[in-house]
């Protein structure tokens, strides 16, 4: 039986491959070998990969974004983009943020729900599936089994020319041909 983690990883690899420009020159594979660029590693703080997301970062808690540690970024990345969705609820979208400077070491908790985030070099946020700008935490239906929430961070070779408030489809289109690497991180939550 294929584990959820392997399925999500395979989906992510397919997504990154689909975002390519058709040329793999200068593209990091994340395997760290053969002189390739340093792989992307960005992790939320306060819980382990595949662990339970602390209540304060959920819709039944303080509903604030978790702090994220940027451990390594490919040298040719200019910006980062982060997408948080729930694959157990038809990829229900909880957060879109892009144009985070690649030299950022830490993304603090509680990013304001504003179109532009001045504290992150003017990063922009998009519209989630709640119809709002910014982060909205996990909020699975009561009684459901734990849902899986995937934080996908993308290393991007440019600053995206995409207006704040954009939706997932618009971000995916803007990323096309500009993704260098992707780092998936999974958390779970139930109520």
What are these regions (language model features)?
Residues 2-15, 19-191:
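N-terminus-centered regions that define maturation/targeting leaders and the start
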């Amino acid at each position: 039986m294929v584990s959820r983690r392997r399925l999500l990883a395979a989906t992510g690899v397919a997504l990154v491959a689909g975002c390519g420009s058709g040329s793999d020159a200068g593209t990091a594979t994340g395997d760290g070998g053969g002189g390739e660029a340093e792989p992307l590693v960005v992790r939320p703080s306060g819980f382990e990969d595949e662990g339970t997301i602390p209540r304060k970062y959920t819709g039944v808690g303080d509903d604030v974004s978790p702090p994220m540690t940027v451990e390594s970024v490919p040298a040719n990345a200019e910006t980062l983009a982060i997408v948080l969705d729930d694959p157990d609820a038809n990829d229900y979208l909880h957060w879109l943020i892009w144009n985070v400077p690649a030299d950022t070491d830490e993304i603090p908790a509680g990013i304001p729900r504003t179109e532009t985030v001045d504290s992150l070099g003017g990063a922009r946020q998009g519209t989630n599936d709640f119809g709002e700008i910014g982060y909205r935490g996990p909020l699975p239906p009561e009684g459901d089994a734990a849902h899986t929430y995937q934080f996908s961070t993308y290393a991007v070779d440019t600053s995206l020319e995409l207006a704040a408030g954009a939706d997932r489809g618009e971000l995916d289109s803007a990323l096309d041909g500009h993704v260098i690497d992707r780092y998936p991180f999974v958390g779970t939550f139930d109520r």
